A protein has these predicted regions:
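Short, strongly hydrophobic alpha-helical membrane anchors
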Residues: 1-13
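Compositionally biased, low-complexity segments enriched in small residues
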Residues: 4, 17-19, 150
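Single-pass alpha-helical transmembrane signal-anchor segments in small membrane proteins across taxa
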Residues: 16-30
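Transmembrane-cytosolic junction motif
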Residues: 27-48
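Structured binding/interaction patches within domain cores
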Residues: 50, 57-192, 196-198
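Charge-dense, extended regions
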Residues: 188-224
Length: 224
């Protein structure tokens, strides 16, 4: 019994030593991490903090691009546009939230790419009545098309940069959102309503995220 007691006692103290060793290693690694962070330039630390505190940092890719589409709709609403004239364009844009089969990203990029103003306005002659109508729509919109085109381009480019190996909460696309808000402010266009934005902020995912019905956030659904 004495030997058993000694074995138990030695095992107990051995466990304490091992635990202390691992605990010490963890503390050491944490201190190294803090030292590296401290030695980073102030600008780098500030940029990291800005990214981590960005309200869309943990929002999925679908949620982020949806916000840009909402900004686009706010611009159309601000300038008194007839949403039925923009319906095809908006439906194609919003389909990014619900597509999920096959090469859905490539399909979306192809369909939306054909609707970008640089493609529409340089196609001569328009190869279909639909494209001709969209071309006339863009032309009539005049200089205000600068803002609309920039928002569409931001949404398109954001999706272009998506990939299956996107890292957790990839911060690269956040600058598209920041640019969109800056442009909206410069043009005097209000940002999207809080209710719709709150819904998007619940779409949290480290990558592209699960499909959802984004069209219900659109003014198209409110006018139907």
């Amino acid at each position: 019994m004495d030997k058993i007691g000694q074995l138990i006692e030695s095992g107990f103290f051995g466990g304490i030593v091992i635990a202390a060793t691992f605990s010490g290693a963890a503390v050491f690694l944490y201190l190294i991490y803090r030292l590296i962070k401290f030695l980073q330039p102030k600008e780098v630390r500030q940029e990291e903090q800005r990214i981590l505190s960005h309200r869309f940092y943990k929002v999925s890719g679908r949620g982020r691009v949806s916000y840009l589409i909402l900004c686009l709709e706010e611009a159309l609403l601000f300038y008194g546009q007839d949403f039925s004239a923009w319906e095809r364009i908006l439906r194609e844009l919003w389909s990014v939230t619900s597509r999920s089969e096959g090469d859905w990203i490539g399909t979306w990029l192809d369909s939306v790419g054909e609707l970008l103003s640089d493609r529409i306005l340089t196609t001569a002659p328009p190869f279909s009545d639909d494209i001709r109508e969209i071309r006339d729509l863009y032309t009539r919109f005049g200089t205000k098309m600068i803002l609309v085109n920039a928002l569409m381009e931001n949404a398109y480019t954001m999706v272009c940069e998506w990939s299956p190996d996107t890292v957790a909460h990839n911060p690269d696309s956040l600058h598209f959102i920041d640019e969109a808000e800056e442009m909206m402010e410069k043009w005097g266009v209000p940002l999207p309503a809080d209710e719709a934005v709150w819904f998007l902020l619940t779409q949290k995912d480290f990558s592209l995220g699960k499909p959802f019905d984004g069209l219900r956030l659109s003014h198209l659904s409110k006018e139907s």
